[in-house]
């Protein structure tokens, strides 16, 4: 029985819709002309932000990607789109400590990421998904618990 786990042999090819492609293009143009700059997408629900963000990351060859959300429940949609449209063959590994993703076959915790990167000849790129609730509980972000220290040590 599958029990809701995403299982695919290979990533699915996709084509962004016109408004998604325009958003990715505009963001990439801004990114390239404003090193260290910030860009905010104010997109309607069902726009396809997840796939658009993943496409942008691939286009600019982002090495470390941090996805922070105030809704841990959406972790499953970020994860399932990663499996469907990127997968490990993209060169990205999906890293998360969010409880909703525990035990999923393509999700690594920080140590799992380090182990996977150490086994390959190349350093894998990473997409890390965290919730604000987890960050708030971390002593590195004003909380009490010794967790998520690595988030402060990476160049996002």
Which residues make up each language-model segment?
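SF2 helicase/translocase NTPase motor core
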Residues: 1-156
């Amino acid at each position: 029985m599958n029990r809701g786990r995403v299982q695919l042999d290979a990533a699915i090819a996709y084509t962004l819709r016109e408004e998604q492609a325009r958003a990715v293009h505009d963001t990439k143009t801004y990114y390239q002309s404003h090193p260290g700059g910030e860009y905010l997408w104010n997109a309607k629900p069902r726009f396809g932000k997840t796939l658009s963000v993943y496409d942008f990351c691939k286009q600019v060859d982002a090495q470390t990607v941090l996805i922070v959300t105030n809704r841990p429940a959406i972790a499953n949609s970020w994860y399932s789109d990663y499996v469907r449209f990127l997968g490990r063959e993209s060169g990205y590994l999906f890293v998360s400590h969010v409880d909703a993703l525990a035990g999923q076959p393509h999700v690594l915790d920080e140590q799992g990421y380090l182990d996977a990167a150490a086994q390959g000849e190349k350093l894998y790129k990473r997409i890390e998904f965290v919730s604000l609730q987890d960050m708030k509980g971390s002593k590195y972000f004003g909380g009490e618990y010794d967790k998520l220290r690595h988030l402060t040590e990476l160049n996002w």
